[in-house]
Every structure is written in C-alpha cells, then in structure tokens.
Amino acid sequence: MASLICKFSGCLQSILLREASCCSRILINHEHKRYRKRSRKPAPWFEPRKTGKLTYGVTDENVADLKQQVWEDSFKPDSPIRAEFLERKGLTDNMIASQYQVDKNFKWKFNTKRTGVIAIKLGMIPQWTKEGEKVMCTVLQVLDNHVIRYTPPEDFQKSQGFHPWFSKNVGSMVVGTLSCSPLLFSKRYNNLFLEAGVAPKRKLTRFLVSPECKLAPGTKLRACHFRVDDYVDVSAKTIGHAFQGVVKRWGFKGQSATHRGGKSWRRAGATGGGRSQAGTRRGKKMAGHMGMDWNTQKGLKILRMDNKYDVIYVKGVVPGPDHCYVRVMDTVLNHRRKGLMKNPPSCPTLLEDSAQKLPSEVLSSDLFDFRDDSISISAE
C-alpha cells in the first residue's frame, strides 16, 4: 500500500511539473527587457575619423605647402577625382582581373541584389505630365561615389556586422561619397581607402549584394546605375524634432481648448492597463524624442534623370531634411520587381564606356518636355 501511494504521488508530481512548465503563470513576475532606442556605443568596425591636433613643430608655411600638394595631386580642376591618388595596397591589376571579373553572360534574376548609391537630397520640384497633372518630385544628386571594399559571403558571415536574418548568399559592399583631403582625417581612417586607391570619403555606407554583382574597389558609381521608369527604395534619417509631447509626436487629439481642466490639455492621459494588465505595456505611445530615425520610402518611381550632373528625379517625398545623405537602392517590392524581368537592369552596374554614350537628359514617357511645343496651331 505504501509503495502504491509513493508511485501515485510521484506520478502526480510529474504531471504537475509538466503542466507548470507549459503554463504561462510561471512567468507572472517576468519583466520585459528595457534598452535604449539609440545606442551610444559605436559599431565594432568604427574607425575614428579625426584625431587630436598634432603639429610636431610644423610651421604654417609647411602646412600651406602640404595643402597645395594635396590639391595638385587629387583635386585638380581638370580631374576632380584621380584614381591614382593613393597607391593600391595589397590589390594589383592582375588580382582585380581575376577576382572581380564581370561576367557578361550573367542575366539579372528576381532575387538578384545590386549595390546602391549615396545621394544628396537637394529638395523638391514640381513636374507636369502630358495630361497636365502636377507631380511633386524629389531631386537627388549622386556625387563622387566609389566602391571602397567588397566582402564575399563566406567572410561576411564571420564578421560582426552579419545578422542571422540576412541571407547566407549575400556579401557586403562599402560605398563612399564626397572625396576630401586626407589632412582632415586620422591615419586609421585614411587606411580604409588604400585598397580602393581613391581619396578619403566623407560618408561611408554598406549595401548587401549578390556575389554575381560584386565590383572591384575603386569602381565609380553614377546616377546611370539606375534607369528612368525604374522603382527604387530611398532611406535616410528623418528630421529631428527633439523631445516632443504626444500631440505632436503621435497626433493625439487633446482636450477641449475652452473647457479644459488645468494643465491636462495636451497630456497623454492614463498609461496603465486595467486590473489584469497593470503597468505600462511596451510600445505605448508616449512623449519622447521625435525624429532622427532611419526611415525608408519604398517603390518610388524615377521620372527624370540628368546624366551630365548625375541628378535623379523621383516621384514623391523622401525622408530627411534638404542636403542630407540618402541611400538609393533597387526596390524590394515584389510587384515592382516583376516588371524588371522583361527589361532587366545592367548587372553589376553600367560601365563607364556605356555611360558616356547616354544622352545628357532622359525623361519618362509620361512627363511633358518643356523644350517641346505645348500647342501647335496650323495655318489656315
């Protein structure tokens, strides 16, 4: 009888433990992890751009001579950017021909990922269609873009910048824009551009690319990387508005302006739940820092392009203030990418020889060209 009671108690205990392990009540005191939305810790691959001012007894005349030498070597009026400014370190012409050889027989596929470009937002300007409809466009200029580094997929998976939700068949390509004098940056930052053989860039960013779309370091990227009537995704940091309340940040209605009570006109009200939902839930719309977050506008159509000045006119609005850096890349929307199957883009990019043969300005078939006659009257 005693052994039967022991077996029954052991069986009952195992059942209770099994039910307790599957029941959510054991997490009744669980606290959600709180973390900062904006981390102050720099990325692990971050290199300091500037260092302390070290003169080492150099006179002002010597500094002027160094600046003049930098200007003559890299920023001459006849050649704004020279690829021979810095000698390539660890990358010869034979290695470029073998490792970064462009496969001319490769055809663009639906899941192919090309590199993007860094542009500067110049503002907005209206355009008109042939039917007379007004369309607001954002003007983006692609200035001095060069490929700085390419990391193959097998090496990119081992890096600290790789995330588990990335595809294992993508590599990393670093693109820089706006060449500057090397006297403005630290030595560690200047060493990042030795492999590409270009002047130090003011802005760097990273794109995920397919192995078939890899480009050699030092390759120049222009606005003709895209085409008119293509759809692109544009991402940038939104305009910062500092600390704002719920009315401006989230669009709360607020209380009555005439019969409000005290200082509760623009307050958020209750922040907690009921009896069973005590405490503030994650994601509650509250007052806080507004703006300065990365935002992406997807599926923007290119209506006009100036190949001479590398200017792109995209339909719609783009996040960020004027004169900010934006990332322009091929769209990820499936219903927009299906149209590229009939007319695929150039992979990995449009070569410099082919870019010189393009017309200076290309407009969409829907836009009206103001150089043409709007009204034609036949003589009677």
Regions found by a protein language model. Name each.
Residues 1-23:
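N-terminal chloroplast transit peptides
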Residues 27-380:
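Extended basic (Lys/Arg/His-rich) segments that typically form rRNA-contacting surfaces
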